[in-house]
Structure formats: structure tokens, C-alpha cells
């Protein structure tokens, strides 16, 4: 199974049974709630889907080095999300959030499925790695989600102790 799909399955397994209150509870004023992390992941999927639909056809096919995408999982390397990827701060139920994430992921998966084989070697800009092939971009989404899965586990521990 690809890291892209594996990470999402792990996310849903980790969050099973959490109440809406716990999903929306912030460990502190400066930290995101689990729901906010999920909203950020939704925005990543939306941005990736838009990029694949609008920019892949014009992107160059070229060989670039494999990037160490797993470093995206390292939470010691803190990064602030760009403003367009920051979460909304409203209360949303877990079932609504899951529906929204599932719909966006289905749209992203459909965009990926519509690509031709050579499109996976096209190169697109990336804010951290400068440029990635479409194949690397898709893997990056999985590694990025695993980073936030660790964050959600930390948040869960903090709010269960509170």
C-alpha cells in the first residue's frame, strides 16, 4: 500500500471513538486541535488536487534527484503553515470533518487516476523541496500526513491528561 493511502488509514484508526468535544479541544491557546489538524490536511489535499488539475499538463518532464521525503515526518523541524493552509477555527463534528476529508480525498484520488503515466514524471514546484515530480508530490502528501498523525497523537495524549 502506498504511503498516501496508508497514512489516511492510520489517521482514521487513531481517531476512532474520539468525541466531537475532544476533536475540537485545543491543548493550549497556541496549539491546534485535532480538528484543526484535519482541516489543514483537507486544505493540503484541496491544494494538491487543484495543482494537479491546473498545472500538470504544462509542467516539464525532467529527471530530478529523489528527495528525502521522509524528513517531512520529523516534527523536530518546525514549520509554520502558509496562511492559505491554516485551519479554520470553527467547531465541526467528527462525522462532518470525516465526510469533508473523504470527499476531498476522493477528488484528489480521481485527479491522480486521470493522469497519464508520463505525467507522474512531470516536475512541479514545492515550498520545502523546491521541486518534486508528481509521483514524489503524492508520496509527500502521505509523509506530511504522517507528520500530522504524530501531532494528533500528541494532542490526544495532552487532552486526555487535562
UniProtKB/Swiss-Prot annotation:
Residues 65-76 have a biased composition (Basic and acidic residues). InterPro entries: DinB-like, DinB/YfiT-like. Residues 65-93 are annotated as: Disordered. Gene3D superfamilies: dinb family like domain. Pfam families: DinB_2. It comes from the Bacteria. This is Uncharacterized protein YuaE. It comes from Bacillus subtilis (strain 168). The lineage of its organism: Bacteria, Bacillati, Bacillota, Bacilli, Bacillales. The gene is yuaE.
Amino acid at each position: 500500500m502506498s504511503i498516501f493511502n496508508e497514512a489516511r488509514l492510520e489517521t482514521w484508526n487513531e481517531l476512532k471513538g474520539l468525541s466531537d468535544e475532544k476533536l475540537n479541544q485545543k491543548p493550549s491557546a497556541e496549539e491546534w486541535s485535532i480538528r484543526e489538524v484535519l482541516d489543514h490536511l483537507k486544505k493540503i489535499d484541496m491544494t494538491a488536487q487543484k495543482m494537479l488539475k491546473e498545472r500538470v499538463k504544462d509542467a516539464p518532464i525532467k529527471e530530478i534527484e529523489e528527495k528525502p521525503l521522509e524528513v517531512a515526518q520529523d516534527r523536530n523541524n518546525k514549520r509554520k503553515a502558509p496562511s492559505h493552509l491554516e485551519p479554520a477555527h470553527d467547531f465541526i463534528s467528527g462525522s462532518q470533518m470525516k465526510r469533508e476529508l473523504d470527499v476531498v480525498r476522493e477528488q484528489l484520488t480521481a485527479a491522480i487516476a486521470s493522469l497519464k503515466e508520463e505525467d507522474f514524471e512531470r516536475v512541479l514546484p514545492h515550498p520545502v523541496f523546491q521541486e518534486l515530480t508528481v509521483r514524489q508530490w503524492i508520496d509527500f502528501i502521505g509523509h506530511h500526513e504522517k507528520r500530522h498523525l504524530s501531532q494528533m497523537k500528541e494532542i490526544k495524549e495532552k487532552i486526555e491528561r487535562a
